[in-house]
Amino acid sequence: MPALSGPQYLGEGLKLIMRPGLRLFVLIPLTLNLLVFALLIGFAMQQFSHWVDLLMPSLPDWLSFLQYIVWPLFVLLVLVIVFFTFTMVANIISAPFNGFLSEKVEVVVRGRDDFPPFSWAELLAMIPRTMGREMRKLAYFLPRALVLLVLSFVPGVNLIATPLWILFGIWMMAVQYIDYPADNHKLGWNEMLAWLRSKRWACMGFGGMTYLALLIPLVNLVMMPAAVAGATLFWVREEGEKALVK
C-alpha cells in the first residue's frame, strides 16, 4: 500500500469509521467522549477568566498597553491546557474501545473484512493491557507538561510557553493515537517511540492535523475515533510491523 502524507491519514481515517462494520466500535467511545466533554467544558466555562488572570503576568502601569497584546496569547494558553486535559481524560476512559477499534480498522485496511461477532469478553480482556499503556503515556506526558506549566508562570519566558505547548501537543497526538495499533501488535513503548522518531515529519503532519481537528468543539468528538482509524492506517502504510522485527 502506498504511504500518504501525514495530514491525509486523518481524512482517510474519517472515511474508514463511516463503514457499517465499524460503527458500533465508534459509537461506544463517542458516547463516553461526549459525557467527558460536557462535564469538562461546563467546568472550564466557570473557571476560564480566573485561569487567564492567574497566568497573565503583572505589568507596571507604563506597560499596561501590552496587556491587550499578550492577553490573547494567554487565552490561547488556557485553551491549549483545557484541550490537553480533555484529550488525556477522554483517551484514558476510552482506551479499551480505541484499541478494539484500531484492531477492527486494521482488519478492514488489510483487506479482510470478515469481522467476528462482537464479544464483550474480548473487549474486557483488553482493559488491563490498554489501561497500563495509557498510564505509560501519562508517565511520559506529565513530567514534560509540568516543565511547560512551570514555564507558563515565569515572566518573560511564559511568552514562549504557548508555541512550546503546541509543538509538544502535536507530537503527543502522534504518540497517543499511533500507539493503539503499535500496542495491539505488542510493540514495546521505547521501540514505539524510536519508530515514531524515524518517521518524525510524517508523525508531525498527522499529529498537527489531528491537533487542529481536536481543537474544534463537538467536531473533536468525531475526530477522536477518526484519529484512531487514521493512526492505524499510518501503522499499516508506513510499515510499522517492520519495527517488530528489529
From Swiss-Prot:
Pfam family, one: EI24
Subcellular location: Cell inner membrane
Membrane-crossing segments per the record: 24-44, 69-89, 148-168, 214-234
GO cellular component: plasma membrane
Keywords attached to this entry: Amino-acid biosynthesis, Cell inner membrane, Cell membrane, Cysteine biosynthesis, Membrane, Sulfate transport, Transmembrane, Transmembrane helix, Transport
GO terms under biological process: cysteine biosynthetic process; sulfate assimilation
Example GO molecular function: high-affinity sulfate:proton symporter activity
Disulfide bonds: none
Topology of this chain in the membrane: Multi-pass membrane protein
InterPro entries given in the database record: CysZ_sulfate_transptr, Sulfate_CysZ
NCBIfam families assigned: PRK04949.1 (NF003433)
Function, in words: High affinity, high specificity proton-dependent sulfate transporter, which mediates sulfate uptake. Provides the sulfur source for the cysteine synthesis pathway.
Alphabetical list of HAMAP family matching this protein: CysZ
Family designation: Belongs to the CysZ family.
Protein name according to UniProt: Sulfate transporter CysZ
The species this protein was found in: Pseudomonas aeruginosa (strain UCBPP-PA14)
Gene: cysZ
